[in-house]
């Protein structure tokens, strides 16, 4: 049973090698080119479904440059399901990857992964790849649990609340 549920927009499915971002006006997906040009880890192939939590804006990240439009809270969705670009789904936060640059990544699971309830439950090889991939541009300071992930989402929420 998924406890805290958030709505997730998938920008880059697991296994994809292109950088994509939903435009700020939410009208189109922008293809920003091959990921390996920016993140050569795993030859640029996304090791986990990547997107954002709908109804959030990342306040920590945007405070570095007040002229920049803030991004939504990033989410890495651990799932056995394959997703399409632009698909929305539901997930449950289990942890948060805290990066030095403030661009933290919430880790969530969906109903296909009942055996994964916390970061430590993810197989070691997959965790290591996720950490190398998302730690390439900015060092990872620490990994925190579900409570901290939910608190971070709520602190960056612009509408609604996490469904319990």
Indicate where each model-derived feature is located:
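Hydrophobic N-terminal alpha-helices or hydrophobic patches in metabolic proteins across all domains
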Residues: 1-164
């Amino acid at each position: 049973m998924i406890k805290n549920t958030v709505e997730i927009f998938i920008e880059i499915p697991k296994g994809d090698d292109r950088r994509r971002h939903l435009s700020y006006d939410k009208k189109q997906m922008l293809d920003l080119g091959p990921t390996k040009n920016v993140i050569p880890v795993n030859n640029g192939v996304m090791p986990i479904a990547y997107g954002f939590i709908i109804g959030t804006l990342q306040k920590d990240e945007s405070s570095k440059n007040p002229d920049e439009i803030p991004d939504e809270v990033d989410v890495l969705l651990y799932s056995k399901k394959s997703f399409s670009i632009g698909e929305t789904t539901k997930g449950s936060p289990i942890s948060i990857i805290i990066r030095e640059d403030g661009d933290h990544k919430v880790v969530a699971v969906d109903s296909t992964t009942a055996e994964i309830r916390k970061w430590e439950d993810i197989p070691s090889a997959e965790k290591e790849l996720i950490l190398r991939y998302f730690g390439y541009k900015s060092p990872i300071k620490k990994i925190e649990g579900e409570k901290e992930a939910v608190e971070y989402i709520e602190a960056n929420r612009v509408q609604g609340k996490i469904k319990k």
